[in-house]
Design a protein with these regions (language model features):
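Non-ligating segments of multi-cofactor redox enzymes
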Residues: 2-238
Length: 238
């Protein structure tokens, strides 16, 4: 909640005394309200489905989970029929190469900045098109990515990655990570995202953590369930 703390500081001076006649901007208030709403929605999902997010998220039909569970939390006052109108169509044939393998990915998105709703999961390329650099790790991030998907006018977010990724494809993607890192070093891409964010993805791709995440994902693809944290009997990808 670093952003939330930063916004709240707008109300105070360094000594903790509230400023007189000083208010955060409309944009800051919008972000604050959105973050508070997302946190409340994440709590609802956790109460309904338990603390084990990976068991909830990594299922064969992630598409159905998002439509039936996540969207019902985002739109609790709407009839269930509305969820069929929310687009998470398949865009595998135009999947962005910088998408980190997993259930959610993007095709050719708009460049209007919808990904700003999910800063811990979404980046943009040289043209401002969005891609997933981190699969959601908790209910909060899943809701934020879902919000970004809704805001994309091209409806280019997809959640049928489990139908298309397989062990060999994940291995090949990981084998080519030096190419993905090279693309991330493009000056225009860095300008769009900020050097710190780009470095986060580069460091992730160079880490044992990313490899372990993909090995666990391959285990899921091969066995149709996500492995326990202490399960190290995982497929080799390098």
């Amino acid at each position: 909640m670093n952003i939330l703390k930063a916004i709240k500081k707008l109300f105070k001076t360094k000594d903790g005394v509230k400023r007189k006649m000083t208010y955060p901007s409309v944009e800051a208030l919008r972000i604050l309200h959105q973050m508070e709403a997302v946190e409340k929605q994440a709590v609802i999902l956790k109460e309904r489905h338990g603390a084990d997010f990976n068991s909830f998220f990594y299922r064969h039909m992630t598409f159905n989970i998002i439509k039936s569970e996540v969207m019902s939390v985002l739109y609790p006052k709407h009839r269930s029929e509305i969820y069929t109108d929310i687009h998470w169509d398949s865009h595998w044939h135009e999947k962005h190469v910088l998408n980190f393998p997993g259930p959610i990915y993007t095709g050719v998105t708009d460049n209007g900045g919808a990904g700003e709703c999910a800063p811990e999961n979404v980046m943009v390329d040289q043209e401002g098109c969005e891609y997933i650099y981190h699969q959601p790790r908790n209910y909060t991030q899943l809701i934020e990515v879902s919000l970004a998907a809704e805001l994309d006018p091209f409806n280019a977010y997809s959640c049928d990655g489990n139908k298309h990724w397989n062990y060999e494809l994940v291995k090949n993607w990981w084998h080519n990570r030096s190419e993905w890192i090279s693309q991330l070093m493009d000056p225009l891409l860095i300008k769009h995202n900020g050097a710190d964010i780009v470095q986060l993805y580069i460091d992730y791709l160079n880490s044992d953590t990313a490899e372990l995440d993909l090995r666990r994902y391959c285990f899921f693809l091969l066995n149709n369930y996500y492995p326990a944290e202490d399960n190290m009997d995982l497929p080799i990808i390098s």
